[in-house]
Amino acid sequence: MADDGVRLVKPGTKYEGAQGVMYDAGVSRDTAGAEKVCMNVLPMPPGAKAKPHYHKGIETIAYMRKGECTVFHGERLESQTVVKQGEQIFIPDDVPHAPCNLSEEECVWIVVHSSGDDQEDLIRTEDLDYILE
C-alpha cells in the first residue's frame, strides 16, 4: 500500500519553546511532515508568562480549551485581551505578543501556526521583557 502521508501524532512529547514555556508537541514538520501548519498544546500553570515575541511572516490562532489567559500584544505590548474557555484569538504575523496566565487556575491552549514549525522565524523581543515584570 502506498504511503499517502497521513500521520497520527500521539501525546507524550514535550519541548520548551524560545518563549520560555513548555509545549505538548502536536502535528508539525518534525512529527508529521507538515510544511504549512502546525498545532501544539500549551498548558500554562497559574502565574506562567511567555516571553514577548513575534512570528515573522507566521499567523497564529489559539483556542482556549480550559481556563483563561491574558494576552499582551502590540508594538509595546500596550494592548491586553483576556481569552476565556471556548474562545479563540487570532494574532497576525509580526505582532509582538505574550500570553500570561494571571489567573489562579491552569489554562490550556490549542495553538496553530501557519508554518510547519512554531519555533521557525520566532523573534524574541527582549527589549519588551521589562513590561511583564
Label the model's feature ranges.
Residues 32-35, 44-49, 66-70, 115-119:
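Short, charged/polar surface micro-motifs in flexible loops or helix N-caps
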Residues 51-53, 71-72, 80, 91, ...:
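Short beta-strand His + acidic residue motifs that chelate non-heme Fe in jelly-roll/DSBH
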Residues 58-85:
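A short beta-strand-loop-beta hairpin characteristic of the jelly-roll/cupin
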